[in-house]
């Protein structure tokens, strides 16, 4: 079987090509990966399905890739200097979304080259640019490719020029393929064999093993499956291995390659990508970016390490029925096995009961985590409005880090610092005005703008992260008819005039509705929430004031009118004084009720107030 040569390991590094695909959501990355799998015959025609590498339901449904996947493929180029030779390709499929930049950066570390995939009908997007710059920083060989050339709307001439300007190549070097029809894919694979350098190592074959972890997944039966890229030396089954950052020693139970399904093998040599299983049950034991080496006579220094991904956005997750709290805790633990960047801590709220304060990489990450909790674990959740990490200096000079409005210190504050991000927005030139206006209302400062081509503009702004996480992205899309693309990266912090707005029901604050907002927006937030709650909370037997306040100063108020029984119905005709007596009696009753009555906010009101157009 000539075709199965990729299943033998300890391949000569000269025959190996490690590459990944960088592309924006919907630019056809998974479809191209499907075609590549078919052409190299590693997937039987009958097993083939669309988006073969996207295993999670939510990935297939949203058409996005969340976890990096890797596949080892055999290929015999038909053209170029390596024609007729057996080349083993290792393709690592990366996520394209801004929140998962960390996943991308790890996948890039494991490769020598990258295919830059751009939709021939849309051109390059902001997030693809960010990932492209990451790849260039890692000195990867970039192969530019235009996909979807079979579309009637495709304009390959225009976009080849745009890509050529960005990465500094000739427009004719940009390859043209169609993942759907398979046109040009073989030429692309031949180009990969020709242009992407083979992995190199500075050490002899018998040097201590060093392998970098670029992903880890939790398998219910076998524990944690760790994906690694071998840099130096060899790893074989039944060896004792050590994780260099934690110093933990494990026994290698199984080592293998993924060719699209996991296959055991006799070990991995330099430059190869595969997986290992140690029977450990906790993903945090195999940290992404860590170095694996032999426990005995192992390597001295670790590879280029990774920083831990830091959560940027926080939100409280509460089960709708308190009985689900233990299930929510188990579900979060299981999710954390697969997603090391998710952080959580228990939190209690007077209004919502017990729940967790979770930290996410960004908004999409938050949405997907919530979706997965609801879908995979059947939980009904309320999530509070997202917030970010603030640094607060009190009057006495003490510092606090606050990411939950209920921890906001009372009394006077000397200064408050909020995180800021550098954003890159790519928009068609017709929408530059409205986009700039939107960024200014969100307290953005312009850093510069460039024309990528005559009708596409790149705008660079520094903005507070707190303004972006609410509804910035939705507003940006609606103002630009869906054509804008956004990328952001953190850029430190700045002094800001922020206040905490409390929502009071009958004079008592409801912690779930509190928010930290800029003083200029406090009035708007207060008005919006009081109006919304006035509609959502059912009328009581007595009048209920809904107020928004900063400290003790009320800035907005709405009244929920009392329900009144018609006490005069049984009073036919009769004297006015009789009617007045009944009305006075009713009034007294309402007054007494108002003093002792409490307002119960129905669950739906919480959900509606916190979820709709989170502004």
Swiss-Prot record:
The enzyme's E.C. designation: 3.6.5.n1
GO biological process terms held by the UniProt record: positive regulation of translation
Gene: lepA
Keyword Membrane: yes
Gene Ontology cellular component terms for the protein in this record: plasma membrane
Chain ranges passing through the membrane: none
Membrane topology classification: Peripheral membrane protein
Function: Required for accurate and efficient protein synthesis under certain stress conditions. May act as a fidelity factor of the translation reaction, by catalyzing a one-codon backward translocation of tRNAs on improperly translocated ribosomes. Back-translocation proceeds from a post-translocation (POST) complex to a pre-translocation (PRE) complex, thus giving elongation factor G a second chance to translocate the tRNAs correctly. Binds to ribosomes in a GTP-dependent manner.
Cell location: Cell membrane
Pfam families: EFG_C (PF00679), GTP_EFTU (PF00009), GTP_EFTU_D2 (PF03144), LepA_C (PF06421)
SMART domains referenced in this protein's UniProt entry, alphabetically: EFG_C (SM00838)
Protein name: Elongation factor 4
Reactions mediated catalytically: GTP + H2O = GDP + phosphate + H(+)
Family: Belongs to the TRAFAC class translation factor GTPase superfamily. Classic translation factor GTPase family. LepA subfamily.
Residues engaged in binding GTP: 26-31, 147-150
Domain tr-type G, first and last residues per copy: 14-200
Entries under SUPFAM superfamilies matching the protein: EF-G C-terminal domain-like (SSF54980), P-loop containing nucleoside triphosphate hydrolases (SSF52540), Translation proteins (SSF50447)
Coiled-coil regions listed: none
Keywords of the record: Cell membrane, GTP-binding, Hydrolase, Membrane, Nucleotide-binding, Protein biosynthesis
A Gene Ontology molecular function term of the record: GTPase activity
NCBIfam families (alphabetical): lepA, small_GTP
The keyword Hydrolase belongs to this UniProt entry's keyword annotation: yes
